[in-house]
Design a protein with these regions (language model features):
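A short acidic, Gly/Pro-enriched loop at the edge of an enzyme's catalytic core
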Residues: 43-54
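SAM-dependent methyltransferase
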Residues: 83-142
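Conserved SAM/SAH-binding beta-strand->alpha-helix loop
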Residues: 22-23
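Conserved SAM-binding strand-loop segment of SAM-dependent methyltransferases
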Residues: 30-44
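Conserved SAM-binding loop of SAM-dependent methyltransferases across substrates and taxa
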Residues: 2-14
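Short alpha-helix immediately C-terminal to the canonical SAM-binding loop
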Residues: 26-28
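Core SAM-dependent methyltransferase catalytic element
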Residues: 144-171
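A short glycine-rich, Lys/Arg-flanked "PGG" loop and its adjoining helix->strand segment in the class I
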Residues: 69-86
Length: 171
């Protein structure tokens, strides 16, 4: 990202370590004044520090990619979180995209999860590789969290099918 959340937390006196897989994003964060930045993938085995809070904002669930990656995500969070730590993650429920005129929602239950999206970035004539991105509804997130030793709490519901969740390890 651009580091806006990291900068706000830094200015509030918090110790912050930002990561991104994009070398350009890492460079932007450094130029903007984020003091501790690494170019890495959250799922990289070498990324193994411990944290009190892990912020995954701006549809932060996206980097998980697919529902099938959620167990790996929760395993990684168990390694990264200090005792009593939490993940603050936001996402959106894309079910509204499948809403009919009568208000019903028509989703192919035999197909892929409706929140699994294939993204490809483009700026002018430069196209990046496509990548998986996960938008997950809170109920599904809660189920996967419980199955993997975490509790999901709804912190705030947004105005357009979006929400902020807190994920904590269950005792």
């Amino acid at each position: 990202g651009s580091g806006c959340h990291s900068l706000t937390l830094q200015e509030a006196g918090k110790e912050v370590h930002a990561i991104d897989i994009s070398p350009l994003s890492v460079e932007v964060m450094k130029q903007r004044g984020v003091r501790s930045v690494s170019q890495t993938n959250l799922f990289n085995e070498q990324f193994a520090d411990e944290y009190d809070t892990i912020l995954m904002l701006m549809n932060g669930s996206g980097i998980i990619g697919k529902l099938e990656n959620l167990p790996d995500f929760f395993r990684k969070m168990k390694l990264l979180l200090r005792p009593g730590g939490c993940v603050l993650m936001d996402s959106s429920n894309l079910s509204y995209l499948f809403e009919e005129e009568d208000g019903s929602i028509v989703i192919n239950l035999a197909g892929d999860y409706y929140g699994e999206v294939d993204f490809q970035m483009q700026y002018k004539n430069v196209k990046g590789d496509s990548f998986d991105w996960l938008y997950i509804d809170f109920q599904t997130l809660s189920i996967y969290a419980a199955e993997n030793g975490f509790k999901a709490e709804l912190v705030k519901e947004g105005t357009h099918y979006d929400y902020l969740a807190k994920l904590s390890r269950q005792a």
